[in-house]
């Protein structure tokens, strides 16, 4: 009997599920990073599919910086309750003691302490030897050259010159003393693939991805949403309601929205088909001096 060929999305799905099962089989204490964004939503859906009808053997880990959009935190807790997954949340206690934030300490310091150092703390505290993430190669140039199984040193640093060859769908999971692995099952997906899969599978995502009237101010050429009273307004600055949406989500003072009327999945996909700019154009931290994605990964960032 001749089976019909798999569609493009079916092939991507099968590859990702294979990688997730490989992680569960090869590592002692794996964990999945859950940032609450669209890629994390797809990863969670794939994780549930990979081990259905059982509960996934891999817990979720969220690094909370205390500056995420309120809708993100509400969505995170709701999805954890709906799916029954084991969700663990970590906030860097040192950052809390110093009251570190993007306004008071700047984007680079905030990202390093609350994200990078917080992630390293959580991985060490949990004894995790593999951390699954939703990074894709089409997002950014340093991620384009990263392996699916990305080996990290005992200090969680990424050495791009010291990685294993990956032939076809064969992955070497053998680690040296102190090493750990970051695993990226969505490596070969594109932003458009993600949205098409969300549409096909009816995957819930944070409403911030859809256009709606939101209070924003213009900062450095980007629309920054006034999500709560912690965002100080500049002299003469007044929030204005604009129809905006977000292509990527992070800490709200560091995440720029785009003008858009795409308030449905179909409209978002149609917008994607004609958009030529990077989805990370709204990540203000990417434009800070010395804050390139590769530099952050060398320091232990995901």
Swiss-Prot record:
InterPro entries: PAPS_reduct_dom (IPR002500), Rossmann-like_a/b/a_fold (IPR014729), SO4_adenylTrfase_ssu (IPR011784), Sulfate_adenylyltrnsfr_sub2 (IPR050128). GO terms for biological process: hydrogen sulfide biosynthetic process; sulfate assimilation. It comes from the Bacteria. The keyword Nucleotide-binding applies. One of its GO terms (molecular function) is sulfate adenylyltransferase (ATP) activity. Pathway: Sulfur metabolism; hydrogen sulfide biosynthesis; sulfite from sulfate: step 1/3. Gene3D superfamilies: HUPs. It catalyses: sulfate + ATP + H(+) = adenosine 5'-phosphosulfate + diphosphate. Keywords: ATP-binding, Nucleotide-binding, Nucleotidyltransferase, Transferase. Disulfide bonds: none annotated. It is an enzyme of class 2 (transferase). Its EC number is 2.7.7.4. With CysN forms the ATP sulfurylase (ATPS) that catalyzes the adenylation of sulfate producing adenosine 5'-phosphosulfate (APS) and diphosphate, the first enzymatic step in sulfur assimilation pathway. APS synthesis involves the formation of a high-energy phosphoric-sulfuric acid anhydride bond driven by GTP hydrolysis by CysN coupled to ATP hydrolysis by CysD. Belongs to the PAPS reductase family. CysD subfamily. Heterodimer composed of CysD, the smaller subunit, and CysN. This is Sulfate adenylyltransferase subunit 2. It comes from Xanthomonas axonopodis pv. citri (strain 306). The gene is cysD.
